[in-house]
Swiss-Prot record:
Chief subcellular location: cytoplasm
Pfam families xrefs: Arrestin_C, Arrestin_N
Organism, as annotated: Bos taurus
Protein name (record): Beta-arrestin-2
PTM-bearing positions, type Hydroxyproline: P176, P181
Domain notes: The [DE]-X(1,2)-F-X-X-[FL]-X-X-X-R motif mediates interaction the AP-2 complex subunit AP2B1.
Functional summary from the UniProt entry: Functions in regulating agonist-mediated G-protein coupled receptor (GPCR) signaling by mediating both receptor desensitization and resensitization processes. During homologous desensitization, beta-arrestins bind to the GPRK-phosphorylated receptor and sterically preclude its coupling to the cognate G-protein; the binding appears to require additional receptor determinants exposed only in the active receptor conformation.
Amino acid sequence: MGEKPGTRVFKKSSPNCKLTVYLGKRDFVDHLDKVDPVDGVVLVDPDYLKDRKVFVTLTCAFRYGREDLDVLGLSFRKDLFIANYQAFPPTPNPPRPPTRLQERLLRKLGQHAHPFFFTIPQNLPCSVTLQPGPEDTGKACGVDFEIRAFCAKSLEEKSHKRNSVRLVIRKVQFAPEKPGPQPSAETTRHFLMSDRSLHLEASLDKELYYHGEPLNVNVHVTNNSTKTVKKIKVSVRQYADICLFSTAQYKCPVAQVEQDDQVSPSSTFCKVYTITPLLSNNREKRGLALDGKLKHEDTNLASSTIVKEGANKEVLGILVSYRVKVKLVVSRGGDVSVELPFVLMHPKPHDHIALPRPQSAATHPPTLLPSAVPETDAPVDTNLIEFETNYATDDDIVFEDFARLRLKGLKDEDYDDQFC
């Protein structure tokens, strides 16, 4: 008989092992009309709790400066959203009844386990990390979501890192089911003292591409002028709109093809260029937008941001988009170029499959198009527990303790890195 499918549950304990948080997943999908709810369970040692309360907080923050620059009480960090939940003692009117997974965990863990629940607002940004430079230390810049559980008499009471649990989650988007129209653009260049023109037309074979999938750029040139096109450059550029105190746009080339294809006067030219944007070719570019990163996992170029119509862009943190630029280098006539916007995302997984990891860290990689190529092999994810989906009984649940701190020999002060 085959094995029953397992339910993956993430587990993390405080350094003093008095508090443990359980989550069914760490990636929460933004469906544009709603966001997956954050539901989990916190287990607390009653002898440690005493007369205190158990609080869980969800924070969305935008770090826009290096952590080592935080001096004199100034922090290069802005909290975009903070929500608090009192897990114990339970409030008289809980926001919703426990989910099926919470019920199973509560039965397994006993009376000292308590559920918590958060709703992520739709207008919050997705998790994005800005790639640090080779010499940068500390937490990377970008947008992240963090769950923190602690025991205290009140929310205002300061808790020690040793007595709390911090766990980073991600808000993600997947490719839409119905892609947009095929991107195309054209332009005509007229030169001084001449009535003849140079016409450039470019198009992509589709609008939506998956990470690792090559782009086919169709370039058609009609040169009725007296100028000569010396070479053709095709590049993919990432645009990151940083919306914080003011809006600024940063662009970074992530792939480029340059060919010495010449187009003589009074002639035409047509060619398909293939180009693939990959993070593996851009490891040294500081400030490049990446999908939100969890420690011990690799990631990929940031997915395109899909904004719901009417959303307030001022609170969106980082908006990511991509364009293909086709440029003709003309002798003694300047450059002629067009841009083609496209969407770069992960495919939407099936409901019964766990949310996909980045290409180089996918425990269960999503089904990609035949042309989509993962970058590297997948390591084993040890930060999870699995139990069988037996709805009749929960006696067969087996927890696999996540003991990375003890295995690595880390000290309590190292716990400040919440990505572990």
